[in-house]
Structure formats: structure tokens, C-alpha cells
């Protein structure tokens, strides 16, 4: 078992399996018969309690909505107020109270906090003292996909560790296991971040968009079929990045099978125009992260691309 006592803050892109990695670390720390490399055995009493979700020495601090999505909490009753997307100060206080109890099984105790950027300043402040001086044998494993959104006071108390994207082979295997129809295309589209809820989100629409820009299909159909704004904006950003790459003679990252089409589009617009479009999309993506209704409509963005649109004779 690790002797590092500083709270660990694991960070990396969304969809790379960060929550699974935190859960695995908790399992490794709590297992009562780990293997030689320190991995949880999966069948001791502690591992069985963990898989039943009833281990008393593990505490998961998550936003309510995420806890339900990740199977860490039961969905709220019908008619209850919608689950929160933030980690509340009350939830932090419950963790702090729990942290002072003694271990039920006489071993390590683990607090998981994910994502730490879901704590507003008051909630984070309520956690600082416990992070600074955790009770004996308490481990903090925290995670974030947005390290730049983590409060400096919290960040400075943690040991930062970056988590990379899955390797291509592992990403393809994970997609095949989920019966993905076109694992290669999806792995490229999400750049191997296959543990996202929907790694393929926006791909079909992006292909329609690309076809329309290349003179096939109708704009109205594209607008009507647009995914939610947050997905649409990211899809358009990916097309833009690939077009900018094509302009510089580089292979596409997200749409590797469509290099020829991307090269035709890339040539239709000045490089600076592509860059400015990308910047507008990045700003819109930051807004939609906070509020999905951030005044963004697919129509506005499709129009934004309208003058790139190649005539159908091409
Ligand atoms: Zn075990």
C-alpha cells in the first residue's frame, strides 16, 4: 500500500476513465488480501462489501446527479427536486463528520471526491482542514477533468497526478465490448476517451455537416437533426481543428477517413478565418459547459459555416 498521505488529485480529459481509476485505487487500499502488486483481490470480505456498495470505510463525495449516473446512489423519488450538479456544503460536512469516525474494519479508510471542481468555494473551504490534516489511515483520492477550475487552496494541498488517454488497443477493445458499430471511427472521434457516456456523440451529425459543406444535403435538414448545443459545438470544433490541420498538410485527428473532403474545405477559407471560427466555438463551448441554453442554436452555427459551403458541382 502507498505510504503517500497527501490527498491525491488525479486529473485528465473527460471520458478517459478517471472515476474508474479512483474507484480502483479505493478498492486497492481497502482490499484485505491484495496481490503482490497491490491490486484488490476481488473476493475478500472487503472487496465483497465494495462490490455490494456497502463498505463502511469508503465515502464517495459526488454531485447528486452524478452519483445516480455512476450507480453510487438511488434515483430520487418522483416529484423530488432535480438532483444537484454541484457538491453541496452539507455533503462536505457529512464527509468531514464521517472522517472522524474510526475504521469499521480496522484498516484504511478512503474518501473519493469527484469532480473536485464541482465544489463552490464555501464547500471547498469546509473540506480544507480535513485535507490538510487527514485523520490517521484516511486516504483522499480526488479527481477532476478541469484542473484549471480547481480552487488554488484545494489544489495546493493535493499531490497532482496526470492521467493519460487510453492506448488505442484498449480504447478499441472497450468500444467492441459495447457493441460499437464502427470502433475505429469512434475511437478517433473521441481520441480514445471511450469511457465518456457517449463517445460517439455528434459524429453522425459532423459527417452530415461535412457532406453539406462539400455540396451534398440541405441546410434545413442539418439544422433539424442537430444534437444538443454542447454536443454540436464540440463537433464543429473537431471539424474546425481537422480543417486547420488539413490546411497545414497534417492528417485529420478526429475524422481520419475524410482527409480529402477536409482538404477541399480547408482550402476554401483563409487560415486566420479557421482560427477565429475555432476561437468563437471554444468560447461557446465554455458557456455551454455552464448552461446548456447559453443562447446557442444550431442554426446560428450552421450559418457560421455557410460561406465555406462548396458549390455542389465541385
Ligand atoms: Zn480483496
List each language-model region with its residue ranges.
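Residues immediately C-terminal
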Residues: 118-119, 133, 149
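Short N-terminal helix/helix-N-cap motif within the alpha/beta-hydrolase-1
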Residues: 121-124, 310
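Clamp-loader machinery-focused feature within the broader ASCE/P-loop NTPase space
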Residues: 1-122
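Charged, glycine-rich active-site and insertion segments that engage polyanionic ligands
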Residues: 1-38, 46-49, 100, 136-139, ...
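Structural recognition of the conserved hydrophobic beta-strand(s) that form the central parallel beta-sheet
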Residues: 111-114, 127, 138-144
Amino acid at each position: 500500500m502507498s505510504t503517500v498521505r497527501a490527498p491525491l488529485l488525479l486529473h485528465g480529459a473527460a471520458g478517459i476513465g478517471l472515476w474508474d481509476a479512483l474507484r480502483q485505487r479505493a478498492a486497492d487500499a481497502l482490499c484485505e488480501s491484495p496481490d503482490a502488486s497491490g491490486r484488490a483481490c476481488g473476493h475478500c470480505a472487503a472487496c465483497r462489501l465494495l462490490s455490494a456498495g456497502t463498505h463502511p470505510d469508503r465515502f464517495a463525495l459526488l454531485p447528486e446527479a452524478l452519483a445516480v449516473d455512476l450507480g453510487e446512489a438511488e434515483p430520487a423519488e418522483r416529484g423530488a427536486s432535480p438532483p444537484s450538479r454541484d457538491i453541496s456544503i452539507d455533503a462536505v460536512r457529512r464527509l468531514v463528520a464521517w472522517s472522524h469516525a474510526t475504521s469499521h474494519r480496522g484498516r484504511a479508510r478512503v474518501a473519493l471526491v469527484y469532480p473536485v471542481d464541482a465544489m463552490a468555494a464555501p464547500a471547498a473551504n469546509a473540506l480544507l482542514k480535513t485535507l490538510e490534516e487527514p485523520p490517521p489511515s484516511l486516504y483522499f483520492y480526488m479527481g477532476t477533468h478541469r484542473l484549471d477550475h480547481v480552487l488554488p487552496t484545494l489544489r495546493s494541498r493535493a499531490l497532482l497526478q496526470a492521467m493519460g488517454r487510453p492506448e488505442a488497443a484498449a480504447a478499441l477493445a472497450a468500444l467492441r465490448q459495447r457493441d460499437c458499430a464502427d470502433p475505429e471511427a469512434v475511437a478517433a472521434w473521441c481520441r480514445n476517451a471511450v469511457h465518456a457516456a457517449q463517445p460517439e456523440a455528434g459524429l453522425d451529425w459532423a459527417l452530415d455537416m461535412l457532406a453539406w459543406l462539400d455540396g451534398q444535403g440541405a441546410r434545413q435538414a442539418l439544422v433539424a437533426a442537430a444534437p444538443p448545443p454542447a454536443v454540436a459545438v464540440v463537433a464543429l470544433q473537431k471539424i474546425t481543428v481537422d480543417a486547420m490541420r488539413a490546411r497545414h498538410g497534417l492528417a485529420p485527428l478526429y475524422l481520419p477517413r475524410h482527409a480529402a473532403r477536409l482538404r477541399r474545405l480547408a482550402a476554401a477559407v483563409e487560415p486566420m478565418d479557421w482560427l477565429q471560427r475555432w476561437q468563437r466555438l471554444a468560447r461557446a463551448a465554455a458557456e455551454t459547459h455552464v448552461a446548456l441554453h447559453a443562447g446557442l442554436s444550431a442554426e446560428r452555427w450552421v450559418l457560421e459555416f455557410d460561406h465555406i459551403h462548396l458549390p455542389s458541382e465541385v
